[in-house]
């Protein structure tokens, strides 16, 4: 049975979107803790021999445990596609970006800036809250007409410590007609 991963996209006006600025998502907690197996699988796939990913004793002394590669930050929060406790298919929660009411049916990521404040190590259980930071007035680009939407994701580990912040800017637009 295939799971429907489609989301309902919110439509509205720029003024509707401005009223959402400052809104935050419900906290979303990873299904599993950061694990050595996933750290090392990722490092193996990208051929990264950083000792902090492979040498448990070295990593424990330097970071408090095997260090999670920075590129895995958002990956820890991706839910498994199926769990034995599920009854039928469960629709994943749509991200805050999809719920911002704006015109436009197409997205492109314009910028992403991640700040790591504390090491993320094996055993950490991450929770993220997303906040709508800003929506630009309408912009005309070669891609089409739309709005830049900026969000801030704040990642915390199980003790409440903020470990990372991810500022993302996305351009939501209506594609320009082909020449």
Model-predicted regions and their roles:
Residues 2-111, 177-179:
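Hot-dog-fold acyl-thioester-processing enzymes
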